[in-house]
Amino acid sequence: LVRWMHVTQSKQQVESADRLGLITNMPAGDSEGDPKDRRFEQRLELMRDSMIYNRNNPSILFYESGNKGISEDHMKRMKTIYDQYDPHGGRVIGSREMLDPGSVAQYGGEMLYVNKSAGKPLWAHEYSRDEAARAYQDNFTPPFHIDAPDYNRNVESMAVEDVRRWWDYYQQRPGSGDRISAGGVKIGFTDSNSHFRGDNNYRRSGVIDAVRLEKDPWYVHQVMWDGWVNSDVPHTYIIGHWTYAAGVVKPIYVVSNGESVELFLNGKSLGKGERSSGFLYTFKDIAWQPGELKAVSTYADGRTSEYVLKTAGAPAAIRLTPHTGPRGLVADGADLMLVDVEVVDKAGQRVPTAFNAIHFKLDGAAIWKGGIAQMEGPADPAKKTSANGILATTLPVELGVNRVLIRSTTKAGKVTLNATADGLTSASINLASKPVAVKDGLLPVFAEDYQPSDLSRGPTPAGPSYTPFRRTIAVANIVAGSNSADAGKSHDDNETTAWSSDGTPENAWIEYDLAKAQAVSHLSLRLTGWRLRAYPIRITLDNKVVFEGVTPKSLGYVDLDMTPATGSKLRITLTGPTKDLDAFGNIVELKNNKEAQSVGADAVPTGWRLSVVEADITGPPQ
């Protein structure tokens, strides 16, 4: 799913998604709010016009009425437009937030937080907002930028955080019971010239940079996302590189969808990694030695996959690799050629520690559009006003690679690009741009007519695209130590309601009657104040303790694996007072205090109050 934000995407973007088979949303236009004046009338008009313009494009599945929750009356007015202009398009209309199952909004989901529903699709409209420049790999790689969460991370740190944040949603995926999360979209999938929070002057949340060179998080998401619902295509990826200075000792992170990962250095086993967040395997305190680092993943069915890193030698030469469209470089004045520039060792392997300055010289029927780079040191205050190397003819490689753009002219002819650097063997490319027919100043064909469509994944499965791994257990009745009239709000598939106890220790419990003895193994809880508040609790099943501990803070739900047992009455008891301390204090654009509506901590004081928004009781699948 690609989510466009705030403004209706261009027709080119819509049609590109059609060609690639990418599901997208379509926003109308908003300034992140719910205005009560003429501005909302304009939004309605824009939704109408955009819907008419794009309703025949199959990639659009969601009409987005706002990048923020809107009133139910405003949502009804948007739904009226949908009913009039696209009643049979097979799409849904909704808005960010809009969690109430009684709303006319046909989908919803908060920014960042994990939402679940048994009815409408709820998906996170933005997750993992952290930023990292592609140039900053880790603390031990030039330019030796020290990791500084959350908006000045190193790429290694950002990749690890992306695994942790996606795991929040993956645990609640289809197959986990009746109430599920529909997933989430990674905000800022590419670095962009937009609102930023780090020490640069552009947004660096992308898993690829501004010229579409991959960072480690690109490959991390490939591991986690390759499948219809489950990550079921074997992948293993070692974050980073294996070219360090003597004496470096650091953790090695491997991302894999296997059941175990073993690490080998020059053929010798370094043991198996410590698994966390489903996909992350950590190998602590690995001492660098030159050679080959290999990770081997083993799957439940005995299959294996592996990934290998090799130590690079000293920088020796420049390598240029051009990328053009299927027709080559077309002399239409708009076509682009992307050229990768790498610094390689004498064996041709990229040197991941190289930051050599490359001098470019372009001749012929083309226009230099250049690339992008950090250009300053990691602590340089000029970053905020930097031109980022835009249009510069001297650019450094970053971690051994960069990319530049060259635009064609309207005249066909030879194009030559030379790249030189001190102490390195130079490189050049030579090609000719191709003429195109022009009639009355217009082109009779368009570039998209020549773009291939990759359908190698095959059709959407005709049957279920997942295998249930948990089963929801029905609740017949709920009683509580206090406020029993509201106890049902803890199990009503509505994240806008909650039950809370009265603040006395003896009344801080709630009990779910399962009607008959059931095999229970798992409890998924959305607790009031979940990102601020930890709850010391005891869970019993027919008076037998199946869990006792403190709930972790989260971005929505805590998943508690209980001692498997069979019983008919599950009770949750608060065993100590609660207190608030934000576990995600640097998340900008989220209210970091108790007033955040979706957290609800402002309405329920700390202390001896157990407060449950939703309790999902599950057992093994039948």
Regions found by a protein language model. Name each.
Residues 249, 257, 263-270, 307-308, ...:
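Short flexible loop/turn segments that cap and initiate beta-strands
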Residues 255-260, 353, 517-518, 531-534:
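Short proline/glycine-enriched turn/loop motifs at strand-loop junctions of beta-rich domains
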Residues 573-580, 602-604:
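Short beta-strand-plus-loop segments that form exposed binding edges in beta-rich domains
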Residues 238, 252-255, 334-352, 416-419, ...:
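Beta-strand-rich structural segments
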Residues 283-288, 389-410:
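Short, hydrophobic beta-strand segments
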Residues 450-517, 526-532, 536, 541, ...:
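Disordered, acidic Ser/Thr/Pro-rich linker "stalks" and the adjacent N-terminal cap
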Residues 302-313, 425-435:
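Edge beta-strands of extracellular beta-sandwich domains
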Residues 3-217, 221, 230-242, 282:
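Substrate-binding/catalytic cleft of secreted carbohydrate-active enzymes
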